[in-house]
Amino acid sequence: MKKQGIFNSQISYFVASMGHKDMLSIVDMGYPIPKDATFVDLVFDKGIPNFIDTIKMVLYELEVEKVIIAGEMEVNNLKNYQKVIDIFSNIEIEKKSHEEFKDIAKNSKFFIRTGECTPFSNIILVSGVIF
């Protein structure tokens, strides 16, 4: 049995499969995941699991060199925006319009849907390298 880290087998597989510059999107309940995308749906109920906790768990195992968010998060969801800024204080944070974000996210290797129910709680994690 695995001792630590991500116990969800699909997410563990997603992280282990990431190469340099691959993208993994963590999104809220209402996000329109592309029809043919590979994703895991973690939603149990509204808010469970939440956006920030999901990011923190993925970061436990994934090396990230850059993140992309919708600029609208700063105005419409200041609480999560500030948490994202704190979590990624040493990593490039690229802001795009929500429409641009959705276009970029279509290229994500994987999606993780959370139970988050606050506006613009979506992020693209761009995989880095550990050397």
Curated annotation (Swiss-Prot):
Keyword Isomerase: yes
Catalytic residues identified in the record: 20
GO cellular component, one term: cytosol
Coiled-coil zones: none
Binding site for substrate: 28, 98, 120-122
EC number: 5.4.99.62
Gene Ontology MF terms: D-ribose pyranase activity; intramolecular lyase activity; monosaccharide binding
Annotated compartments: Cytoplasm
Gene3D superfamilies documented for this protein: RbsD-like domain
Pathway named in the protein's UniProt entry: Carbohydrate metabolism; D-ribose degradation; D-ribose 5-phosphate from beta-D-ribopyranose: step 1/2
Subunit: Homodecamer.
Recorded family membership: Belongs to the RbsD / FucU family. RbsD subfamily.
Protein name: D-ribose pyranase
Organism name: Petrotoga mobilis (strain DSM 10674 / SJ95)
Taxonomic lineage: Bacteria, Thermotogati, Thermotogota, Thermotogae, Petrotogales
